[in-house]
């Protein structure tokens, strides 16, 4: 695979290899055949980052070969959304001959939605001044005149200039209901929107007969918490990043959801609070004992769950675990399988044509 060519004819074969690999990895814990969720074969990534290469008068996006580290010119990127591809051409055309915008520009980041909104961030090795703001405003207005719903941001050391806003609002159809998700520039969002919809619908399906409340660790902008709220009496969720917490609070209001509570704290801190080890001012006014959480949802970073969180989640009758790294999932399962069995297993092809796998497991207490 190269940035400008996707081996779409190999999609089914690479997916079958992932299914076999996941099934083999999970064999010590489950004999289940994974439920498989396919990605679109192209235009599936909703965000992308590119370095910029200045070559005389020419200017273009580049990526680096992971093996050789050599640079690769990228004029089109079929893995990314159609909107990103349109913006890539428009940004180069708008920046190439404008000194204020081009000088010391080294990277452009694109974030888009299925609702055809975009935030484009321009990263510089220089101080951004009023001349830059005026030039960027003119570029933004020209892009909008082309029918592009885009917001521009300038970034430099200790500097961030928003011409109007640093977020976009995604709208996803999830099991018959439209969900609104505010996505903030430079914060985590699910890269493959079509796959995100399938993950949300799978999580809804496997928790449809739930009793009691849901606890979620690492909730981000509320992606899973808000979709799952319809299956539970109440949802209590934690997140450490301030922009994500703010986006989650907006999303709660935008989706008219009244049974989700977001707490800004790390999963490790929440574990300490639940175990009575420490008290936190952020939990004032929240009676943790009031929640009857029968299900816990975790979507941890690639490092998986730490040992203390492993012990904490074992106290719940059901554990819903979304993993972006099956190796650390299996490491966690060495502990979790002592008290729980794997009752559902899914493979989500979040990153086609790569070795990366996203998977989900539902664990029920023995």
UniProtKB/Swiss-Prot annotation:
Induction and repression of expression: Growth rate-dependent regulation of transcription. Is a novel example of a mRNA regulated through a mechanism similar to that of a stable RNA (rRNA).
Alphabetic keyword roster: Methyltransferase, S-adenosyl-L-methionine, Transferase, tRNA processing
Pfam family, one: tRNA_U5-meth_tr
Entry annotation: catalytic residues: 324, 358
Catalytic activity: uridine(54) in tRNA + S-adenosyl-L-methionine = 5-methyluridine(54) in tRNA + S-adenosyl-L-homocysteine + H(+); uridine(341) in tmRNA + S-adenosyl-L-methionine = 5-methyluridine(341) in tmRNA + S-adenosyl-L-homocysteine + H(+)
GO terms under biological process: tRNA methylation
UniProt: S-adenosyl-L-methionine binding residues: 190, 218, 223, 239, 299
Top-tier EC class: transferase
Top-level taxon of origin: Bacteria
Keyword Methyltransferase among UniProt keywords: yes
InterPro entries recorded: MeTrfase_TrmA_AS (IPR030390), MeTrfase_TrmA_CS (IPR030391), SAM-dependent_MTases_sf (IPR029063), TrmA_MeTrfase (IPR011869), U5_MeTrfase_fam (IPR010280)
A Gene Ontology molecular function term of the record: tRNA (uracil(54)-C5)-methyltransferase activity, S-adenosyl methionine-dependent
This protein's GO CC annotations: cytosol
Family affiliation: Belongs to the class I-like SAM-binding methyltransferase superfamily. RNA M5U methyltransferase family. TrmA subfamily.
Function noted in UniProt: Catalyzes the formation of 5-methyl-uridine at position 54 (m5U54) in all tRNAs.
HAMAP family in the cross-refs: RNA_methyltr_TrmA (MF_01011)
This protein's name: tRNA/tmRNA (uracil-C(5))-methyltransferase
Source organism (scientific name): Salmonella typhimurium (strain LT2 / SGSC1412 / ATCC 700720)
């Amino acid at each position: 695979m190269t940035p400008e060519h996707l081996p779409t004819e190999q999609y089914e074969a690479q997916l079958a290899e992932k299914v076999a690999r996941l099934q083999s990895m999970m064999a010590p814990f489950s004999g289940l055949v994974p439920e498989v969720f396919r990605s679109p074969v192209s235009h599936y990534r909703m965000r992308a980052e590119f370095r910029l290469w200045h070559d005389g008068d020419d200017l273009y996006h580049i990526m680096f070969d992971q093996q050789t580290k050599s640079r690769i010119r990228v004029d089109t990127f079929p893995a990314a959304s159609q909107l990103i591809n349109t913006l890539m051409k428009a940004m180069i055309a708008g920046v190439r001959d404008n000194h204020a915008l081009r000088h010391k520009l080294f990277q452009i980041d694109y974030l888009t939605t299925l609702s055809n909104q975009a935030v484009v961030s321009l990263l510089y090795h220089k101080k951004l001044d009023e001349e830059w703001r005026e030039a960027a405003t003119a570029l933004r207005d020209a892009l909008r005149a082309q029918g592009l719903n885009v917001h521009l941001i300038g970034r430099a050391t200790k500097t961030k200039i928003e011409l109007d806003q640093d977020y976009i609002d995604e709208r996803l159809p999830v099991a018959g209901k439209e969900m609104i998700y505010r996505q903030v520039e430079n914060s985590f969002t699910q890269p493959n929107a079509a796959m995100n919809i399938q993950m949300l619908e799978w999580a809804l399906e496997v928790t449809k007969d739930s009793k009691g409340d849901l606890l979620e660790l690492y909730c981000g902008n509320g992606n899973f918490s808000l979709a799952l709220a319809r299956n539970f009496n109440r949802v209590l969720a934690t997140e450490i990043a301030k922009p994500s917490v703010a986006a989650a609070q907006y999303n709660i209001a935008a989706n008219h959801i009244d049974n989700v509570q977001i707490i800004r704290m790390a999963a490790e801190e929440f574990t300490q609070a639940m175990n009575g080890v420490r008290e936190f001012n952020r939990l004032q006014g929240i009676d943790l004992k009031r929640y009857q959480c029968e299900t816990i949802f975790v979507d941890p970073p690639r490092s998986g769950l730490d040992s203390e969180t492993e012990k904490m989640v074992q106290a719940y009758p059901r554990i819903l675990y979304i993993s972006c790294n099956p190796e650390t999932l299996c490491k966690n399962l060495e502990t979790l399988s002592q008290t729980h069995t794997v009752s559902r297993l899914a493979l989500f092809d979040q990153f086609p044509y790569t070795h990366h796998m996203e998977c989900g497991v539902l664990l029920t207490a023995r």
